[in-house]
């Protein structure tokens, strides 16, 4: 809609049927099967690369480590190498607010966040040796229509509709929720800046609602929106290890970006 030609790198297992027919018709898909990224980047000839691929796990088991490293470190490194070999220098990537436990400059909430930080260390090498211009967008909790993930808003809405009791933590942890459309707008805006050779915009930014509400407050707001009571059993579950009680709040906002969706927050 903004005049961009879009190419996407997907896995053989990617569910493209989850995309609308209109979207599928406007995107040039390239299937990644390992060791093909240099050829894919050469064929696509991108002006800007946006890197969103990741494996998110709030908590991991030992068996999850290879997949976490492959998705969050190995794939991204191969992508950077492919960009360097094809002289593609503009790069937008997704980080996470969970790299900043208790508001620290760097303290990973979990191994997922640690792999994100590890990738950024690798990116630094390509910035210095291949002349990459990079914008990092630190994401918080996201929501939106058609979300198939079993995230907290979906669970709350499902409980309201079915009437089945939902076992939850005490609910005092705060969340910073941003609609997926607003997240997409941040990526579009960052890409436009880089396409216009705005090197001054390089750096990291928070894609944040600018406010945080407790899970209890979010549930109460959702009840009003749905017109139904949520049968929540508060305190039935303990807080997770390293639960984020207060989201990171000191990140700078990408110039020109502001959220439009304020239904929940």
Which role fits each region the language model picked out?
Residues 48, 75-78, 90, 118-119, ...:
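Conserved cofactor-binding/catalytic machinery of classical short-chain dehydrogenase/reductase
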Residues 55-57, 95-104, 140-143, 175:
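Active-site segment of SDR-like NAD(P)-dependent oxidoreductases
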Residues 111, 121-175, 180-184, 188, ...:
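NAD(P)-dependent short-chain dehydrogenase/reductase
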């Amino acid at each position: 809609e903004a005049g961009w030609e879009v190419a996407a790198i997907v896995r053989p297992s990617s569910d493209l049927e989850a995309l609308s027919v209109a979207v599928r018709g406007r995107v040039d898909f390239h299937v990644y099967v390992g060791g093909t990224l240099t050829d894919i980047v050469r064929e696509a000839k991108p002006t800007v690369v946006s890197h969103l691929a990741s494996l998110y796990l709030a908590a991991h088991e030992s068996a999850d480590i290879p997949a976490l490293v492959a998705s969050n470190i190995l794939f991204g490194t191969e992508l950077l190498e492919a960009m360097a070999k094809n002289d593609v220098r503009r790069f937008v990537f997704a980080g996470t607010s969970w790299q900043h436990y208790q508001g620290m400059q760097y303290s990973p909430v979990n191994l997922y966040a640690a792999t994100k930080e590890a990738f950024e260390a690798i990116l630094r090498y390509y910035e210095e040796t291949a002349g990459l211009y990079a914008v990092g967008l630190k994401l918080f909790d996201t929501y939106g229509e058609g979300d198939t993930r079993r995230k907290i808003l979906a669970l709350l809405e499902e409980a309201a509709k079915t009437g089945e009791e939902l076992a939850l933590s005490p609910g005092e942890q705060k969340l910073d929720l941003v609609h997926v459309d607003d997240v997409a707008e941040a990526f579009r805006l960052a890409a436009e800046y880089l396409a216009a050779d705005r090197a001054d915009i390089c750096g990291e930014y928070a894609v944040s609602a600018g406010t945080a509400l407790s899970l209890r407050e979010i549930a109460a707001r959702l009840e009003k929106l749905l017109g139904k009571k949520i049968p929540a059993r508060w305190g039935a579950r303990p807080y997770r290890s390293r639960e984020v009680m207060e989201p990171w709040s000191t990140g700078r906002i990408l110039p020109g970006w502001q959220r439009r969706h304020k239904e929940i927050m």
